[in-house]
């Protein structure tokens, strides 16, 4: 293989990405829309790149062909009664990546939850499926610092009861969640 571009989103694996090594640069070029832990070393060494875009812009970049997608690898739930597999906890850029891909390869995992919304794909749209039954990878939860907790309390006081939130990863988001425990809904 030569000149294969591997585009990823939020990598949660703690170890370095095995494809992001200097000796493999002729074969693989790692790119990400975030700076995930598993690519930080490679990015510092110039072996991997960040795609300078907001998360919300990535679907447009896929659909416009600015980031072409030949093959999309994804993890999905088992199909529902209508044959749809949910992207579950990965309902971000993979939906548009899969939509634009020439080939779609799915790891179907019974542990992937079915989630509401349009982030799903019909099993007939998958070119290959690998059945896997393994717990989902979890992001380690960092302990919020005292400053994180003060910021979290300030933010939580501004959030009305019943609000819908998108929460990131890190000490401050965890502090916000902790501070929201007094909210009822």
Protein language model regions, located:
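Conserved alpha/beta enzyme-core scaffold
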Residues: 1-185
């Amino acid at each position: 293989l030569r000149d294969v571009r591997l585009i990823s989103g939020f990598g949660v694996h703690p170890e370095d990405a095995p494809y992001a090594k200097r000796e493999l640069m002729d074969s693989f070029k790692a790119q990400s829309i975030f700076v995930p832990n598993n690519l930080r070393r490679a990015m510092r060494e110039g072996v991997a790149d960040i795609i300078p875009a907001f998360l919300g812009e990535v679907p447009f970049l896929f659909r416009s062909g600015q980031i072409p997608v030949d093959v999309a690898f994804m993890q999905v739930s088992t199909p529902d009664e209508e044959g749809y597999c949910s992207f579950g906890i990965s309902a971000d850029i993979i939906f548009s990546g899969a939509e634009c891909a020439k080939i779609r390869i799915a790891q179907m995992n019974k542990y992937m939850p079915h989630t509401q919304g349009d982030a799903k794909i019909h099993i007939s749209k998958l070119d290959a499926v690998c059945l896997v039954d393994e717990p989902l990878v979890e992001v380690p939860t960092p302990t919020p610092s005292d400053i994180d907790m003060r910021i979290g309390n300030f933010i939580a006081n501004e959030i009305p009861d019943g609000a819908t939130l998108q929460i990131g990863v890190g000490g401050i988001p965890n502090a916000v969640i902790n501070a929201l425990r007094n909210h009822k809904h």
